Amino acid sequence: ARAGNRTLTDRDPTAHAEILALREAARALGSERLTGCDLYVTLEPCTMCAAAISFARIRRLYFGALDPKGGAVDSGVRFFAAPTCHHAPEVYPAVGETRAATLLRAFFKARR
């Protein structure tokens, strides 16, 4: 499944790329449990997305750029390390970090 951030176009604060991709994958596979699936994202997931990744039982999470301001995996609350987190995927941070930073700069420039 593929998705991009649609919070503005959908007027939906939950329409982050991760959430949309998880929804699409769950529909395609016919299950809310995505146990054999890996997720690749450009930016470190926020708390909401990290929780959804945990609930979906994603096997591996790869992300390009750290997000010290809003990230919740290696930054901020470090959701997967919390005792209330029932499933933590294998996490691979800073995968393609330079390319991710370029994509993010273009995305936020177009958004402004």
Feature locations, PLM:
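Immediate flanking context of iron-sulfur cluster ligation sites
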Residues: 31-43
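Ser/Thr-centric signal marking residues that sit
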Residues: 14, 42, 47
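Non-catalytic, surface-exposed connector residues within folded enzymatic/regulatory domains
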Residues: 11, 15, 33, 71-73, ...
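Short connector loops at helix/strand junctions that flank enzyme active sites
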Residues: 16, 34-36, 56-58
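Conserved catalytic cysteine-centered active-site region
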Residues: 28
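A short, polar/charged loop-to-alpha-helix boundary motif
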Residues: 6-20, 24
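Short hydrophobic alpha-helix segments
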Residues: 1-4
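Zinc-dependent deaminase
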Residues: 45-112
